[in-house]
A protein has these predicted regions:
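N-terminal accessory nucleic-acid engagement/regulatory domains that precede
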Residues: 116-120, 124-166
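Conserved ASCE P-loop NTPase core motifs with emphasis on AAA+ ATPases
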Residues: 127, 169-200
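Short conserved motifs of the RecA-like P-loop NTPase core
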Residues: 136-147, 160, 194-198, 306-308, ...
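AAA+ ATPase "lid" subdomain C-terminal helix
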Residues: 149-174, 398-444
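Short, mixed-charge aromatic SLiMs
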Residues: 181-187, 241, 433-443
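Non-catalytic, charged low-complexity extensions flanking SF2 helicase motor domains
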Residues: 420, 425-483
């Protein structure tokens, strides 16, 4: 980036100086040895002195490298001198401060214009690839350019060199996998790359939701070229319902069906005790997700993301500012990023989040009905004991009334342990005995689940084809659920 800046500046400035706290201040492009380290205050004094000595036709540029490390100390003398430099009346010199992306400047110099240039320009990237292999086809250059997007110049050079060293060629899949690892490491644990080794057929039931997702799959701009340019890219959904009903499993299944990455936002690492660090973490996480597109952004337990959002006196307004950043992200053009937000308490979400336009729909994922439990048993049998035939056993369907999909699977696994200990084959009676001893959450949290179900009647679309209400005609349509 420094070399690129010098290349552009050489057309406008007569002298270009570089500075860092290790090597001092020196004239760029000269062969003489760099000077000994110079104190930042002394360096700023030299810049101020230079302004009064240069001739009217001379212009100097000072590039301060890694200067964000110096600004962290909030030295009042240093900040005051920088402020004096910004208030020059005769602009014979200019100063460029280089630091990490999303640098927050102290208030006294906050009026300095900021430009985030974290990624390499596409034309520069094509030149770099052509220099490695002059005979590379144009379509391969385009694919490799997409595979390297979101990286800095040095990171691109490293991945290209690694591909050539290991495979003796520029391999798109290898570079894409390495790029994903680099971006996730850059996020410092704020996001997590999850496995997406199943598809929508691996999840039992929820046919209405799966049909809705399949209709929008071909319009996901990160996945395939668009023929209908007027149809916008799907933005995302909010899923609510009792725990264990498949909200999280569907995220992995959708990523597998759409053949894109599944990225989980780790809100446990997001919040920090340092002032401004939480907002910075959220910004870094969301920008990294954009760089990883096409992908599905999974925000699990969404209700825990904004606890007590209305009371800003308890946290100094951190949660309110975080909400503002997230709203800006949801409202912006984010083609190639599908947000999958799951929550057990839809009522506790801020109303701004649920406004139409930020998500495509709100779905209520209820406990599986009889037909869905049949599908779940078929999937579990094929997964664990394909040689056993328990299909169509009405007693099992009766015994699992009120069970979630996760509870059915756990009871199934418990039965396998019982059979392994007695060296017997899994049968209907073993499963029934295990199910009888199992206490589902629908019994433990009956009041909470009933309350959530009734609350969602006129506020969400049902993920299953059949609704568990006899008085469906009384249901008022939810404007957002009809989209």
């Amino acid at each position: 980036m420094v070399e690129r800046c010098i290349e552009i500046a050489s057309k406008r400035f007569t002298d270009i100086y570089r500075y860092n706290i290790s090597e001092g201040l020196w004239l760029a492009g000269k062969k003489q040895t760099k000077k000994t380290p110079v104190d930042p205050l002394e360096m700023l004094d030299r810049i101020l002195a230079t302004e009064h000595k240069v001739k009217y036709f001379e212009r100097s540029l000072f590039i301060l490298e890694h200067f964000d490390l110096v600004l962290e100390n909030q030295d009042p003398y240093l900040l005051t001198k920088l402020k004096l430099i910004t208030e020059w009346r005769c602009h014979h010199s200019a100063v460029v401060i280089m630091g990490r992306p999303y640098l927050e400047l102290p208030e006294i110099i906050s009026d300095i214009p900021k430009l985030n240039v974290a990624h390499i320009d596409e034309n520069d990237l094509k030149e770099m690839l052509s220099a490695c292999d002059p005979h590379i086809p144009e379509d391969e250059i385009r694919d490799l350019t997409d595979a390297l997007k979101g990286l800095s110049i040095l990171e691109c050079q490293n991945l290209i060199s690694l591909s050539l060293a290991k495979l003796k060629r520029l391999d798109k899949d290898f570079i894409t996998n390495q790029r994903t690892s680099v971006l996730c490491e850059r996020a410092n644990g704020l996001i997590e790359l999850c496995e997406a080794d199943i598809d929508l057929n691996s999840v039992g039931g929820l046919e209405a939701l799966k049909t809705w997702l399949l209709k929008r799959g071909r319009f996901f701009k990160g996945r395939s070229p668009q023929t209908e340019s007027r149809v916008p890219c799907p933005k995302g959904v909010i899923l609510t319902g009792p725990p264990g009903c498949g909200k999280s499993a569907l995220a992995s299944a959708l990523a597998g069906s759409w053949q894109v990455k599944l990225v989980k936002l780790n809100h446990a690492c997001l919040f920090s005790s340092l002032v401004g660090q939480t907002e910075r973490n959220l910004t870094i996480a969301l920008e990294t997700v954009k760089a990883l597109s096409p992908c599905i952004l999974w925000i699990d337990e969404f209700e825990k993301f904004f606890p007590q959002i209305g009371d800003s006196t308890l946290d100094g307004g951190v949660l309110s500012r975080s909400l503002g950043l997230l709203l800006e992200f949801l409202q912006s053009a984010r083609d190639g990023v599908f947000v999958w937000a799951t929550t057990n308490r839809l009522q506790s979400l801020p109303q701004e989040i649920m406004r139409a336009g930020r998500f495509d729909a709100i779905f209520f994922v209820d406990l599986p009905n009889r037909g869905e439990r049949t599908s779940i048993f078929e999937i579990l049998l094929g997964k664990y004991v394909p040689e056993v035939d328990l299909k169509g056993r009405e007693s099992l369907l009766d015994a699992t009334e009120g069970f979630s999909g996760a509870e059915i699977e756990q009871a199934f696994i418990d039965s396998l342990y019982e059979c392994a200990e007695s060296e017997a084959e899994l049968d209907e009676f073993t499963l029934l005995r295990t199910l009888k001893a199992f206490i589902p959450l629908s019994r433990t949290l009956k009041e909470d689940i009933d309350s959530l179900r009734k609350w969602c009647v006129s506020r969400a679309r049902f993920a299953s084809c059949s609704e568990p209400f006899k008085d469906r005609e009384r249901r008022e349509p939810c404007p957002m659920s009809q989209r």
